[in-house]
Amino acid sequence: MFNRRAVIKTAALGAVSIFALMSANASQAADKELKIGFVGVTSGPAASWGTSNVRSMQVRADWLNEFGGVKIGDDTYKIKIVTFDDQKDPKRAIAGMEKMAQEGVHYVVGPNVDDGAAAVRPVAESKGIIYFPYSFPKELYTPPASNAVLGMIANYQSGPAIYKYLKENKGVKRVAFVAANESDPLSQRDSGIEAAKALGLEVISTSDAYQNDTRDFTPVLTPIVMQKPDLLVLSGVAPGNAPLLIRAARELGYEGFISTETAQDAKVLEEGAGELANGFISVGGASTPEIASDTMKEFVDRYTKAYGEYNDESNTKVYALDYIIETMKVNPAAIDNVEEFKKTMDTFSAPNPFVKGDDAKLTYVGTTSFGQKRQIGIPMVVTEYKDGKFETLFVAQVD
């Protein structure tokens, strides 16, 4: 006998099953996860370099996830940031990169210093990882190397621009260099000396160095200050040491210019040197009020609300995650295949969300410096510290 009630019940159960299946599939699609790693320094005197990276990545990831994630190919992904503090130790950097490989991470931001960036290269190349160091040795970015992408402006790009500006606009003629006795700052010192000499400047100090844990810089700076340079370059100086060096130089009576090619933290300068830091020149974040888009302004606002403060360096550090994601959007096969990512870099172009204007683009650069495109394209913003904040000195570009 035809049982209408049974048919209705069966149909209802079928509908529920189909709905459950659709919900499960939708949930599965929504739950796709794209892990992006960070291996760098978030403790010690250089902590602000890596902390700026992590905070920038997390704020941007949370923002993208808030709007449903990112669509790459046919799938939508939520971004998960996986972090590792290498404590500025190359051995720990290697361990961090190995951890990323174990977790299936193919794209890593960092490390922040030369030793770490060089140390992780074999792991990155053997495990199929593209990494974005904030360190300057050219051998990381020139052929046959191909897995590292410079995430900022290099000292050998910004240094000559700073020295030329000071020579032409401030009458600087004599330059002295001082650096921590570590490979990263020493390398930057050597590049700076070469650039200064190429500009016809007189270099009066080329070998002065200090241990990175030094806290009294008076003995180090006394013989330099006595030579009365027009410009004192703090090569590769860590943010925690910069105010100590500045304070010591000023208290010794030095009245000339002080600069560095590394990014700094305005709050650290204010707390450690106060008004004595006024006039200190450094490479700022890749934004100024004049060029910042509404997206950049909102990023700063979200960052400040999340952490109670903002680091100007994050104007640069915000870029890495977008470069990774936007390159994958152009070639979805790059999600788990870094060779596909590399193929896309030469012709890659996408709107730059952080700079005003329709003609602002994200593109890879570095051909002049490295013979291949292994650097993210960002504005070169040189800043001058004044009364607790950085003010723009000039803006330039690299190719």
How would you describe each model-predicted region?
Residues F2-T10, G14, A29-D399:
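Extracytosolic ligand-binding ectodomains
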Residues A12-M22:
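Bacterial N-terminal signal peptides
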